[in-house]
Amino acid sequence: MPVGLLDKANVHWEEALKLASPLLSRVTESNCAALYLFATITCLHTFALGPCPGELLIFNQNGPSHWLTLFRGLRSIEQACDFAKVQKEELHPIFPLSGLELNNAPAKALDPSVQEALEALASFIDINVTKDDERRESMVEALTHLRRCYTLAYDEPAQVSAYTVFSWLHRVSDQYLKLVQATDPVALLLFSYFVVLIKGLECAWMVKDWPTHLMSGIYACMPLSKRFWLSWPMEQVGWLPAE
């Protein structure tokens, strides 16, 4: 994006942020659709700006992720209002992420290589997170949602949408996100498989450069002894570490 246009976009965004931020603590049926749209556009704004060193969407190497706070704020807006009552036909394209029925994912079999990769991920979790491990519930839940997103995304790859992909990040637990932020290797591996789904959105210009940026950050945070588990996600994203 040309520098002049980028400066103008930032001015408009900062003005909108000043107007909308005070309302986020006072969500009502009359403003929730507008606030939901604002939060959605704000998340897209971060993507459009492009990746910054050390910022990995759901965790930053230099502090908390402001993008994640905004993205998860979408859930808070949904919970504060009954979207079924306030949603108008013209606002249907911004239906809440929680409305996407992952449980109704088609039963169509995945490509054998993808299925094998997901099974390898499940094995990694079983080996590294035992049944009495306090991390297990959040990890298994994240894996379950991820499988459903993969099924939807790979069933009609030409029609994969950001709603399908980011519904995973919308549904994972706060505990799982804390584990990612603590650079837990199992949580990082799950995140790397999510990055593969983001790769499928690269037809949208604002997603360009994000998959390789995220994968390189995950690789840097992964313990040396477990980096080989990232082989499949790295291959799918098209990123390899420098020699």
Identify the role of each PLM range:
Residues 63-82, 89-243:
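C-terminal effector modules of eukaryotic transcription factors
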Residues 52-55, 173:
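Short, solvent-exposed coil/turn linker segments
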Residues 49-51, 85-90:
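A short secondary-structure junction signal
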